[in-house]
């Protein structure tokens, strides 16, 4: 796939909303709208318009270097591109059938299995973590060729540190990100570790976590601290690293230079409380399917002042003022439901897995409503 559209085009269209008919209109501030999906679960096809497409558990969303939106559709095991100018979808990776195949060939002919997060490196190439194949894959966007860069397809476990990442073992990787040097970081939640793949050597190591899935102290060392269920890692423009712990019900600041971790949100207990007070005293998550709790996705504003958190099992998006440390709810009621669009305080969500802030616009992967929603704050 050849990236041809520019970031400038995205910025020009970023203040417009794609309606279900596929046309653009001005966004009404402080109202939630449906950006993509009908709410009906199905299989989106090449060329579908955003408002007519039937999504199936959209899990993660990013803006690519071409200014388009890319998202993983967990239920169909595909990755899609959404063009802001035309509102049309195109398939980037996956056949729609779960499995493992296709390395060395076109990503659109490859089988994926449970894609969670998608990210781009500095060269504009795409990375996909596949939970149920226990791997991370790479798509060369100029050619569309897919390959495996970490993990052993179909095999789970914890092994391989110090050797080639493609011979290592992961256990249901859920989140990925890349630093400015294109080193790859993998949230390896069932191993309770954050793994790192060196961009130059391809060697995998453990970057953070000691493998214990117990409650973490408020501060500790990178590799000596228990990190229960690392779920998503966000690296900000100003170089701060934030890690969400799913089973740990917290968010931690990682300092690579000092090799330390520090709690900045979540007291470690599950629940839904704390709005209006310190984020470190708040509770995230509640017992959901499989007993999963805690935050599932993070996004920080470009100025570094605000963090948004997908509090999946509470069916809300939380907001943290990183200057004051105060937490609040940005979207959702705390009850599971489907909208209605409009007032963010009254719009019910259903297990949102990801949130993305770009400029003043907030996008939400409202996963089990099979929608991507949008909020333009007042």
What are these model-derived regions, one by one?
Residues 68-70, 125-127, 183-185, 240-243, ...:
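Conserved beta-propeller blade signature
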Residues 63-66, 120-123, 178-181, 235-238, ...:
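Residue-level detector of Asp-centered blade-edge/turn motifs that repeat once per structural unit
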Residues 27-57, 87-114, 144-172, 201-229, ...:
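Gly/Pro-rich loop segments of beta-rich domains
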């Amino acid at each position: 796939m050849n990236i041809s559209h520019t970031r400038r085009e995205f910025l020009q269209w970023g203040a417009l909303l794609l309606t279900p008919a596929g046309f653009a209109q001005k966004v009404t501030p402080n109202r939630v709208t449906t950006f993509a999906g009908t709410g009906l679960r199905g299989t989106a096809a090449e060329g579908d318009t955003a408002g007519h497409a039937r999504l199936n558990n959209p899990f993660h969303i990013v803006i690519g270097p071409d200014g388009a939106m890319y998202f993983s559709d967990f239920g169909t095991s595909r990755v899609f591109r959404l063009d802001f100018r035309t509102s049309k979808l195109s398939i980037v990776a996956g056949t729609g059938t779960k499995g493992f195949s296709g390395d060395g060939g076109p990503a659109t002919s490859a089988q994926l299995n449970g894609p969670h997060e998608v990210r781009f490196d500095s060269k504009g190439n795409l990375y996909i973590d596949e939970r149920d194949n226990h791997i991370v894959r790479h798509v060369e966007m100029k050619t569309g060729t897919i390959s495996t860069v970490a993990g052993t397809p179909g095999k789970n476990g914890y092994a391989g540190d110090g050797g080639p990442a493609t011979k290592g073992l992961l256990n249901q990787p859920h989140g990925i990100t890349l630093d400015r040097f294109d080193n790859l970081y993998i949230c390896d939640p069932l191993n309770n570790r954050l793994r790192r793949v060196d961009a130059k050597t391809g060697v995998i190591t453990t970057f953070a976590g000691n493998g214990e899935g117990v409650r973490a102290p408020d501060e500790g060392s990178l590799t000596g601290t228990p990190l229960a269920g690392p779920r998503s890692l966000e690296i900000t423009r100003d170089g701060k690293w934030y890690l969400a712990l799913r089973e740990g019900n917290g968010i931690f600041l990682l300092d690579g230079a000092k090799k330390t971790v520090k709690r900045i949100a979540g007291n470690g207990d599950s629940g839904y409380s704390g709005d209006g007070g310190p984020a470190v005293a708040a509770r995230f998550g509640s017992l959901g399917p499989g007993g999963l709790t805690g935050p599932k996705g993070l996004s920080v504003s470009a100025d570094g002042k605000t963090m948004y958190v997908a509090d999946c099992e509470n069916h809300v998006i939380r907001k943290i003022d990183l200057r004051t440390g105060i937490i609040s709810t940005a979207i959702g009621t705390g009850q599971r439901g489907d909208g209605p669009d409009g007032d963010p305080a009254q719009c019910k969500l259903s297990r949102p897995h990801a949130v993305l802030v770009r400029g003043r616009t907030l996008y939400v992967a409202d996963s089990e409503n099979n929608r991507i929603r949008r909020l333009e704050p007042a």
